[in-house]
């Protein structure tokens, strides 16, 4: 089993989790192929994490399975936008941490 972590990505964890749930349990090669056709910005980061985890273990993409793909919330950057009458509203810029684990599929013995 090998893993890769990408930290402090300027992407909302809620949006990234939608993509992470799609690839969990998939073959790594199939997951990378399906992520390349997704229009979401988070798909690029998750594909990068999967290919990095495969390379960290010295595997080929077709021989491993995405065991887990977890997206955790990172720190939130807070900015202010000036509003009417001298007030201000808060702009939240969330960040994410992506953790991907890949491993060889467990053989099913009858």
From Swiss-Prot:
Assembly and binders: Part of the 50S ribosomal subunit.
Protein family: Belongs to the universal ribosomal protein uL22 family.
Gene Ontology cellular-component terms listed: cytosolic large ribosomal subunit
GO MF term (any one): rRNA binding
Highest taxon listed in the record's lineage: Bacteria
NCBIfam families per UniProt: rplV_bact (TIGR01044)
Keywords, ordered alphabetically: Ribonucleoprotein, Ribosomal protein, RNA-binding, rRNA-binding
Stated name of the protein: Large ribosomal subunit protein uL22
Gene source species: Campylobacter fetus subsp. fetus (strain 82-40)
Functional note: This protein binds specifically to 23S rRNA; its binding is stimulated by other ribosomal proteins, e.g. L4, L17, and L20. It is important during the early stages of 50S assembly. It makes multiple contacts with different domains of the 23S rRNA in the assembled 50S subunit and ribosome. The globular domain of the protein is located near the polypeptide exit tunnel on the outside of the subunit, while an extended beta-hairpin is found that lines the wall of the exit tunnel in the center of the 70S ribosome.
GO biological process, one term: translation
Name of the gene: rplV
């Amino acid at each position: 089993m090998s893993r890769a972590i990408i930290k402090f990505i300027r992407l909302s964890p809620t949006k990234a989790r939608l993509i992470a749930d799609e690839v969990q349990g998939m073959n790594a090669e199939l997951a990378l192929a399906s992520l390349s056709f997704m229009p979401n910005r988070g798909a690029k980061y998750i594909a990068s994490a999967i290919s990095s985890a495969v390379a960290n273990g010295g595997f080929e993409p077709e021989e491993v399975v995405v065991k887990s793909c977890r997206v955790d919330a990172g720190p939130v950057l807070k900015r202010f936008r000036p509003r009417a009458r001298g007030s201000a509203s808060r702009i939240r810029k969330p960040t994410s941490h992506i953790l991907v684990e890949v491993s060889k599929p467990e053989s099913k013995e009858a």
